């Protein structure tokens, strides 16, 4: 199986954009925290988060199929991680998130992007961020307009958590 270090190198090989790298690292950090919280394999969950958008920059029309069919199998990425990455984009792959790692990857993807956008407009970034301010931004459809509110809601449902609890957990993760 691929190591965290190998996964980092693979991500850096395919992703040049600092913002997309940051997004992937945030999703990896979120997945790592949830894996530890749920007593799951933190390395697999972290790597799934880190590599979930591996092909987005170079092959946007083929995302995530280019990665899951061509790139990740050759990099010795496990079938579990490949399945999670496949299921994080069900509208593109037809594969719905079913296993725990798949559901959590879906749940962390869009909300991490949204929380990063919220942090960018706050002087203290994540420090002192509250659910109420995030919720207010969520209701403002013009703020981070490219982030799917439906996917954020569905993600919280998939992991059986109120959105406020999911967001609160992630804020805590990103302030560590």
What are the roles of these predicted feature ranges?
Residues 167-176:
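Long, highly charged low-complexity segments enriched in Glu/Asp and Lys/Arg with interspersed Ser/Thr
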Residues 128-168:
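Divalent-cation-assisted or electrostatically stabilized phosphate/pyrophosphate-binding catalytic cores
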Residues 4-8, 44, 78, 131, ...:
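Alpha-helix initiation and N-capping motif
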Residues 5, 9, 25-29, 64-66, ...:
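A generic alpha-helix surface/boundary motif
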